Amino acid sequence: MFKKFTREDVHSRSKVKSSIQRTLKAKLVKQYPKIEDVIDELIPKKSQIELIKCEDKIQLYSVDGEVLFFQKFDELIPSLKLVHKFPEAYPTVQVDRGAIKFVLSGANIMCPGLTSAGADLPPAPGYEKGTIVVINAENKENALAIGELMMGTEEIKSVNKGHSIELIHHLGDPLWNFSVE
């Protein structure tokens, strides 16, 4: 999603009203229930959320100059900077060491990268197709990427072929390096 994202893709910037800010907080908590305990730390009551409208109907939301989440259609997706602050709040999968270089170059994740030794998928029933997941790597402390499941985790285990996660955002991509100022 952010492979060719540049400053020229930004169309407008505006401050978000406090009523919309409350709605965004509620939506984040609904999508990621584990974030409820830290939502006020994440978006302090006195802080101002800035909405940055971009090309392809992408909306970035920044707090204090840092993009914390973004939206393509309806679902709010955390940025990796937010994930690194609160890693336990999101659905997570783990790829094996062999997949790291491909993930960091922006490639979609294949099923074998999630089912081999060193990889980790959640126990049954797992996650459904379309779930936004944080992608960790074997023996690495911080998340590598964020993606959307192209099939459920149980199907990934049984099929073990083809693309399983469409990458949305990864370390080193233009969103990771994007500066609001």
Swiss-Prot record:
InterPro entries: MCT-1/Tma20, Pre-PUA, PUA, PUA-like_sf, Uncharacterised_CHP00451
Domain of life where this protein originates: Eukaryota
A Pfam entry, by short name: PUA
SUPFAM superfamilies: PUA domain-like
Subcellular locations according to the entry: Cytoplasm
GO cellular component, one term: cytoplasm
GO molecular function, a single term: RNA binding
Modified residues (N-acetylmethionine): M1
Keywords (A to Z) from UniProt: Acetylation, Cytoplasm, Protein biosynthesis, RNA-binding
Residue runs in coiled coils: none
GO terms under biological process: formation of translation preinitiation complex; nuclear-transcribed mRNA catabolic process, nonsense-mediated decay; ribosome biogenesis
Subunit note: Interacts with TMA22. Associates with ribosomal complexes.
Cited function: Involved in translation.
Family as reported in the entry's similarity comment: Belongs to the TMA20 family.
Further remarks about this protein from its record: Present with 4220 molecules/cell in log phase SD medium.
Family annotation (PANTHER family): MALIGNANT T-CELL-AMPLIFIED SEQUENCE 1, MCT-1 PROTEIN
Protein name per Swiss-Prot or TrEMBL: Translation machinery-associated protein 20
Organism of derivation: Saccharomyces cerevisiae (strain ATCC 204508 / S288c)
